[in-house]
Amino acid sequence: MVLVNAISEKDYIKDSRRRKKEEKEFEKLRKLLVEGLEDIVRDKKVLKAMFRVPRHRFVPEYEQRAAYTDRPLEIGHGQTISTPHTVALMCEILELSEGHKVLEIGTGSGYNAAVMAELVGKTGHIYSVERIEPLVNFARKNLEQMGYDNVTVLLENGSMGYPRYAPYDRIAVTCAAPTIPKALLEQLKPGGIMVIPVGDYSQELIRVKKDSNGNIYKKRKGEVIFVPMLGRHGFPRS
């Protein structure tokens, strides 16, 4: 029995050292990735948040080695985690600050929510809506393991938003809609900003600003590719 315990302890120490080495390697790769984003994103707060969030902890194990490449990765159920440069760009467009209350449509693995959580701080909160239950569970586990207690993941169809906690300072949509859903515009606080991809095969990232009088202003921010939004204000199921 003593011998078994000794071997187990030895294996534990060996495994612990291996994991620490891997984490250091991932940190180096993350640093290189963030440095590569500096030509796309100028907001230093966003870049720091991107460095603080370990992307490899938000993808399936078989994708971890590719976590710090600037490309989308599969997370199962026909869904993907967005490219790091897209996540950073959307966060920059949103102009996130301490204390903001944010609605996210499309949680995925929880990675985007984690980056936004870094930017809104402990006094802010992210309400993230996801329609696929296994991804809700995956995201909750990832966020809990990383200590993000300022993120709430909700099992809902996001095409209607989430009126319970409205209005929101910011709304981030990580799936492409045919048009900007009226429900989301209504849930955006005056002075608030929303970022949303619009279109089917050819999508554009749109920055939406609501002024203090409720007037809506839209600005195109470039071409993107996202999975489609499904539901009442999304695309029909194929």
Curated annotation (Swiss-Prot):
GO terms for molecular function: protein-L-isoaspartate (D-aspartate) O-methyltransferase activity. Pfam families: PCMT. GO terms for biological process: methylation; protein modification process; protein repair. The keyword Ribosomal protein does not apply. GO terms for cellular component: cytoplasm. Keywords: Cytoplasm, Methyltransferase, S-adenosyl-L-methionine, Transferase. It comes from the Archaea. Its EC number is 2.1.1.77. It catalyses: [protein]-L-isoaspartate + S-adenosyl-L-methionine = [protein]-L-isoaspartate alpha-methyl ester + S-adenosyl-L-homocysteine. PROSITE patterns: PCMT. It is an enzyme of class 2 (transferase). It is found in: Cytoplasm. The active site is at residue 82. Gene3D superfamilies: Vaccinia Virus protein VP39 (3.40.50.150). InterPro entries: PCMT, SAM-dependent_MTases_sf. Belongs to the methyltransferase superfamily. L-isoaspartyl/D-aspartyl protein methyltransferase family. This is Protein-L-isoaspartate O-methyltransferase 2.
